[in-house]
């Protein structure tokens, strides 16, 4: 989907030319694009950080609204995303290789620690990653069972399945996939790997399908298992928790934190983080007179959680489960 610019948000006439929109080449549409960027950008002259560059959908929209004095720092650990960003020619834009959990260190290196006007995190796997069979994220396309966000680092899904105990495998399926039949599926996988290695996505998908006794309507039986393995292999929830804390440290007072998540585990983590920072130090004695400043409230909520409307879902069905939450750092 090509992004249609709002005329009121058009690039400034003297701003550098924004990189050509090549999102269509990847059949990828950034979810909640306009809403996220509008919530993020309180100052066109500010410094912003896109913690999940992907194929640049959000970064491109930020640059379109950024003045010549503004600055955008983006991060990604996917080599394909880095290759896309390397083609961009805009003096306001810098792309760094790294995990979004490292964003405070990356911001420090760029002399932007506590100077950021906004941090955007678009969490989870991207459409280009799902659509590329060689990455091993999707049960709909046969390919090597990899699932790593950065294929140059860490253990692949196939390697993990080959060595993990049945009990630990079941725990991962239950914790990260909320899979009711985790034990049954883990047992089937362990039995199969005793006969031959499970190395491809189609092998795993068919195995889970055969072992699953009750399919959810409209959902492939392997959906939850693939999600669980991907989250575990990439340490996604630990990374997200660290990224939220790092974002809070990197923001300037008044800076915005915008997070888009795609499943309940992510959203619960984000919701809890924002809620706790809005409430402040709730462990202080309730029977003592306490000034508001003593509560050490770090964030203020900005609006309610937002979901894509039906028009966006019709254009991009993968947006259906997205939730966006916005908070502002207090001084």
Curated annotation (Swiss-Prot):
SUPFAM superfamilies xref list: Putative methyltransferase TM0872, insert domain (SSF81799), S-adenosyl-L-methionine-dependent methyltransferases (SSF53335)
Residues holding S-adenosyl-L-methionine: 56-58, 76, 100, 122, 129
The UniProt record lists the keyword Aminoacyl-tRNA synthetase: no
Catalytic activities: cytidine(1402) in 16S rRNA + S-adenosyl-L-methionine = N(4)-methylcytidine(1402) in 16S rRNA + S-adenosyl-L-homocysteine + H(+)
Keywords: Cytoplasm, Methyltransferase, rRNA processing, S-adenosyl-L-methionine, Transferase
Pfam families with a match to the protein in the record: Methyltransf_5 (PF01795)
GO molecular function annotations of the record: rRNA (cytosine-N4-)-methyltransferase activity
InterPro entries found in the cross-reference section: RsmH, SAM-dep_MeTrfase_MraW_recog, SAM-dependent_MTases_sf
Gene Ontology CC annotation, any one: cytoplasm
Gene3D superfamilies: Putative methyltransferase TM0872, insert domain (1.10.150.170), Vaccinia Virus protein VP39 (3.40.50.150)
UniProt keyword annotation of Transferase present: yes
Subcellular location(s) of the protein: Cytoplasm
GO biological process terms held by the UniProt record: rRNA base methylation
Family: Belongs to the methyltransferase superfamily. RsmH family.
Protein name: Ribosomal RNA small subunit methyltransferase H
